[in-house]
Amino acid sequence: MPSEKATTRHLPGAVETLSPRTGRRPETPAYGSWLLGRVSESPRMRRVRIQGMLTVAILVTNVIGLIVGAMLLTVAFPKPSVILDAPHWVSFGIVPGYCVLAFILGTYWLTRQTARALRWAIEERTPSHDEARSAFLVPLRVALAVLFLWGAAAALWTIIYGLANRLFIPRFLFSMGVIGVVAATSCYLLTEFALRPMAAQALEVGATPRSLVRGIVGRTMLVWLLCSGVPNVGVALTAIFDDTFWELSNDQFMITVLILWAPLLIFGFILMWILAWLTATPVRVVREALNRVEQGDLSGDLVVFDGTELGELQRGFNRMVEGLRERERVRDLFGRHVGREVAAAAERERPKLGGEERHVAVVFVDIVGSTQLVTSRPAAEVVMLLNRFFTVIVDEVNHHRGLVNKFQGDASLAVFGAPNRLSHPEDAALATARAIADRLASEMPECQAGIGVAAGQVVAGNVGAHERFEYTVIGEPVNEAARLCELAKSYPSRLLASSQTLRGASENECARWSLGETVTLRGHDQPIRLASPVQQLQMPAQSADIVGGALGDHQTHTIYRGAHPTD
C-alpha cells in the first residue's frame, strides 16, 4: 500500500504513517491523505474521486452492517429461527427486496442531495456563504438518511416478524437499532473525510462549520458513546431480554454476548481509528509545515480543511507564515536600502547614534562624463545604463564582503571593514576595484568610470537624528578615495590607489600594482604616491590642473613592482 496510508500509533493521540522502512516519513499531502488528491487537481477529477469514495464507503459500511445483523439474528439468537419459524415470503422476499430497494433508492437520493448541496463545486465556482454552510451539513444528511433506512427496516421487519412470533420483536428492534446507529455514525465520519477538499473551499469564504457535534471534544465523545456505550447497553439489554423473553442457556447466552461484542469491537476500532486519523492528520500537516518553516521555506500556506479547533490551528499557522513572509519582505527591503551587513547589525543590537573608530578601505567609483551622458540620451535609457553600472559594482563589492554605503547620482561609495570586520580590508578593496575596472571595460565599454581606493582610520556608525539616521563612515580615507577617483579619470587604467593602501595589503595583492608619481591631491596638504594596476600607469600632460599642484620636473618616476611601497 502507498506510503501515505496511516494507521494508529497510539490512541487517542496521533496516527503513525505506514511506509516502507526507509528511515524517513513521507511528506503529508495537503488534505492529509493521498486518497483525496492534490490541491492542483482538476475540479472534474476531484468530483469523480469524491463521488467514488462516498459510494464505496457507504455501500461497504451498510453491507457489513447487514452481515453482522444476519449473524445476530441467526446465530446469536437462534430461537425462534428467522428461517424455520417465520414465513418464507418474509425471509426470502420482503427482507431481500427491501435491502435491494434501500440500496438503490438510498444511493440515488444521497447522490442527488450531495450534488445539490455541492452544485457550486460542479459548476466550478466559488460558493456563496449559504452554499458553503450547506456543504458542511452533507455528512449529517448522509448519516440521517442511513439511520432512517435502518430505522425503517427495523420497524418493518419487527412488525412483520412480530406477527409471526412476538419473540422476534425485541430481537429485531435491538439488532437493527444498534447496527443502524453504528453504521450511520461510520458513514458520517467517512463522509466528513471524503469531503475535505470541499470543506477547504467552503472555509475559504468564511463560513462557520455546521455539524452533528462541534469540536474535537464533541467528536471524541460521540465515538466513545458508540464504541463503549452501545456495547455495554447491548450486553445489558441481552441480559434483560434473556430473563424476560428468551430464557437462553448459559452456553447460548455466552455465544450471544460474544457475537454481539465482536462486531461492535471491530466497528469500535474502526470508528476510533477514523477519529484518531481525523485528529492526527491536521496536526501532522502543521508539524511538517513547521519543519519547512524551520528550514527557511515560507513559500506555501496550508489548506484549511478541518472545521474543529484543528482548523483554527491551520489558520493560525497561515497567519504566522504570512507574518514571517511580511517580515522577510521588510528585511529584504531594508537590506537593499542600507546594505545586508548594516541590516544584520541593526537586528543584532539596538541601533543608536554615534560610531566607533575602524580601520577600513574605501572604494569610490564615478562615471566619466556623466553630464554629457545625461544630455545625450533619453532619461529612461540613462536609468537603465546606471542600473547596469551599479549592478557590476554591487556584485563585486558583495563578492568581496564589502558594503555599498552610498549611491550618489552616478557615483558610489563602498566600504570594506565596517560594519563587518575584515582581516585584510585593503586586499578586499583593491581586488574589488580591479574586478570592477575589468568588468566595466568588457561589459560596458560605453560607460567609463574613475575608481579610487584609499585606506585608514574612520568613524563608522549611525549619523542623523533619533527619528531618521543612516549608517556611514566619516574620515580622511573617504575624501582621499573621492579625490583619487577624480584623478583616475585622466589615466588609461581609470583606477588609482594610494601607496598607503598598498602598505596594508598582502604581498600577493601588491604584486598586481605598480607605484608611480607622488602628487598632492586637491584639499590635502601632504603629497601621496599613486599606485595603479601593473603596466597601466601613465601620467597625462594635463594632470597638473587636476591634482591642483605643480609636479615640476618630476613628470616621470621609477615604477616599483611586486614589493611594498616606500615613500
UniProtKB/Swiss-Prot annotation:
It comes from the Bacteria. It is found in: Cell membrane. GO terms for cellular component: plasma membrane. Pfam families: Guanylate_cyc, HAMP. It is a multi-pass membrane protein. Residues 277-329 form the HAMP domain. GO terms for molecular function: adenylate cyclase activity. The chain crosses the membrane at residues 57-77, 90-110, 142-162, 173-193, 221-241, 257-277. Keywords: Cell membrane, Membrane, Transmembrane, Transmembrane helix. InterPro entries: A/G_cyclase (IPR001054), Adenylyl/Guanylyl_Cyclase_3/4 (IPR050697), HAMP_dom (IPR003660), Nucleotide_cyclase (IPR029787). Residues 361-485 form the Guanylate cyclase domain. Belongs to the adenylyl cyclase class-3 family. This is Uncharacterized protein Mb1354c. It comes from Mycobacterium bovis (strain ATCC BAA-935 / AF2122/97). The lineage of its organism: Bacteria, Bacillati, Actinomycetota, Actinomycetes, Mycobacteriales.
